[in-house]
């Protein structure tokens, strides 16, 4: 791992996977110490809990399940984040900085509206917005499983898909997540 400036002719050896993980965790640990002074949610920015969530993710990759669980528990037990109630879940998809969001980039329309550059634009049904791509169709398997419970909150984020447009047969296979701010 390169942690110091190199000369132009330097040829450092490749680090092992273990060495990389060790360096990543060291960097995160060093950062956590600096971020710990303000253990509050900083919407739109990486904060202390973002750091701890990344540590949990790295530990999962390392198969350090106890370490990952301990890091995740720190976030859960902090009380800073709250899971949505089913009644609030659908509306949460169209809002920034929800109560479950540990890290979310803050992007405003004044800075850079993600509308046609967002993942949601590619998932949206063709023609729902000007030039929407309509490249996403939920599988029949997924829709059948979803159909086993008509009260499943995920129906709240589904819309008619391309099959409906082409065949005029209602099929809720398009998703409106990530539509931009």
Show the residue positions of the predicted features.
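Aromatic-anchored glycine-rich loop motif in surface-exposed flexible loops
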Residues: 1-41
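Hydrophobic-face positions in mid-chain alpha helices that act as interaction patches
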Residues: 6-11, 25, 69-181
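Generic helix N-cap/helix-start motif at coil->alpha-helix transitions
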Residues: 10, 48-49
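Aromatic-lined, polymer-binding surfaces characteristic
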Residues: 45
């Amino acid at each position: 791992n390169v942690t110091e400036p190199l000369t132009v002719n330097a040829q450092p050896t490749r680090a092992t996977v273990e060495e990389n993980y060790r360096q990543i965790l060291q960097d995160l640990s060093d950062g956590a110490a600096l971020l710990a002074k303000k253990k509050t949610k900083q919407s739109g920015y990486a904060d202390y809990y973002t750091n701890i969530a990344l540590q949990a993710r790295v530990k999962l990759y390392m198969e350090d399940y106890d370490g990952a669980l301990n890091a995740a528990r720190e976030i859960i037990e902090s009380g800073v984040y709250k899971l949505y109630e089913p009644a609030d879940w659908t509306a949460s998809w169209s809002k920034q900085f929800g109560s479950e969001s540990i890290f979310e980039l803050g992007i405003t329309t004044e800075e850079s509206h993600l509308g046609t550059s967002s993942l949601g634009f590619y998932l949206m049904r063709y023609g729902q917005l000007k030039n929407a791509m309509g490249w996403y169709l939920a599988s029949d398997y997924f829709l059948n499983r979803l159909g086993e419970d008509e009260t499943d909150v995920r129906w709240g984020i589904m819309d008619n898909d391309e099959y409906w447009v082409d065949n005029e047969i209602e099929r809720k296979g398009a998703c409106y997540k990530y539509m931009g701010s």
